[in-house]
């Protein structure tokens, strides 16, 4: 059906479509958007990331209705939400659990892209938007910038130390700037993805095999086939999400750290300062380097390295299914290093932990720095002309 045909529909819906082409949008993005037939469990996490972001936005809106920014009011307002606001404890735990859930599904979403080569041409732009989700900047690291660093930190804080001005600025960033940036990046990600089409576990372009009707032979409409699949995945995810939220909201100090249940005291430093668990990888790399400036640079490179994967990978194939043992070995080392660094980042800065972080840091960076060489030398398998359905 063309846009003109949808606009001639009788009644209110036809009137709306004439002014706002809702039918055309739904067809382009859902019913006439063809996705590969062989999506597997790894393709759940994109829709789950969007779901968790919606949970974060709505729970955050309700929290801001009762939260008061300020040195004298912030802690008490959180306690008020937990004890006095009706279902305030539920909203807070929903938001704190959602923060960790968001990074879990985003990391898995990015790992799927690495597995199946979704960053290779023509999907460099969708990959760039997706990899940005994992990037956060610790403000104190600005102090490592030569000459202007200390003054820049003071300007960001708005004071010589953490004060009301700092809390207000961070609150504005957290409530307005970060959500808007994420929404913008997600929209760009989806627009770019629908322009070039989805990748699949085989790394085969379904647009290269079209039927007489001009539609991909190995593709099916996203709706209703994958929307139903995603609804099932959402149901399973929400059961696990609710189990954590109701029975293990702090996840043994991983999701909500114990010191955050104590009022801030500038005269009492916690025994061990740790970042949020999902930044443990980058914090471990930061501590692994003795020099503060070099450590900040190493951490920044560890984040930005994902952006350059489309140009570092010289393999003629996309999917890990058809790559050789060399690439699979480096990928295994990278996964082990990532998990180990995340664990070490939450441990005290003891010499043993710091040394281990340096060892695993080598494994982390070797995956990226040596990629132009081992992907070129690796012996690959023949790639099929059409998608397959093996595990």
Please give the residue ranges for each predicted region.
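Membrane-embedded and interfacial regions of multi-pass energy-transducing membrane proteins
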Residues: 2-101, 105-391
């Amino acid at each position: 059906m063309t846009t003109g045909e949808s606009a001639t529909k009788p009644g209110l819906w036809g009137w709306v479509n004439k002014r706002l082409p809702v039918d055309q949008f739904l067809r382009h993005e859902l019913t006439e958007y063809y996705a590969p037939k062989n999506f597997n469990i790894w393709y759940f996490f994109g829709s789950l990331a969007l779901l968790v972001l919606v949970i974060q936005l709505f729970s955050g809106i309700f929290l801001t209705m009762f939260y008061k920014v300020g040195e004298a009011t912030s802690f008490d307002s959180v306690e008020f939400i937990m004890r006095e606001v009706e279902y305030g404890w539920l909203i807070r735990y929903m938001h704190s659990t959602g923060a960790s859930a968001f990074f879990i599904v985003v990391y898995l979403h990015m790992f799927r892209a690495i597995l199946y080569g979704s960053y290779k041409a023509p999907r460099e732009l969708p990959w760039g938007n997706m990899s940005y989700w994992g990037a956060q900047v610790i403000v104190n690291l600005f102090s490592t910038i030569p000459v202007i660093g200390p003054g820049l930190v003071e300007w960001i804080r708005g004071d010589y130390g953490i004060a009301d001005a700092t809390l207000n600025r961070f609150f504005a960033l957290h409530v307005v700037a970060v959500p808007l940036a994420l929404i913008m990046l997600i929209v760009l990600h989806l627009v770019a993805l629908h322009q070039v089409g989805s990748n699949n576990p085989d790394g085969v372009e379904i647009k290269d095999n079209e039927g007489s009707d001009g539609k991909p032979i190995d593709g099916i409409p996203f709706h209703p086939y994958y929307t139903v699949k995603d609804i099932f995945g959402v149901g399973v995810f929400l059961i696990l999400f609710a189990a954590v939220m109701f029975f293990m909201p702090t996840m043994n100090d991983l999701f909500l750290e114990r010191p955050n249940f104590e009022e801030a005291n500038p005269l009492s430093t916690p025994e061990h300062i740790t970042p949020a668990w999902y930044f443990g990888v980058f914090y471990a790399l930061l501590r692994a380097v003795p020099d503060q400036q070099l450590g900040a640079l190493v951490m920044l490179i560890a984040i930005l390295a994902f952006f350059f994967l489309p140009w570092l990978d010289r393999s003629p194939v996309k999917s890990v299914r058809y790559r050789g043992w060399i690439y699979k070995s480096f990928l295994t080392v990278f996964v082990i290093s990532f998990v180990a660094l995340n664990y070490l980042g939450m441990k005290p800065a003891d010499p043993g932990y710091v040394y281990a972080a340096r060892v695993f840091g080598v494994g982390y960076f070797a995956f990226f720095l040596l990629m132009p060489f081992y992907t070129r030398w690796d012996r690959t398998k023949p790639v099929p002309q059409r998608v397959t359905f093996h595990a």
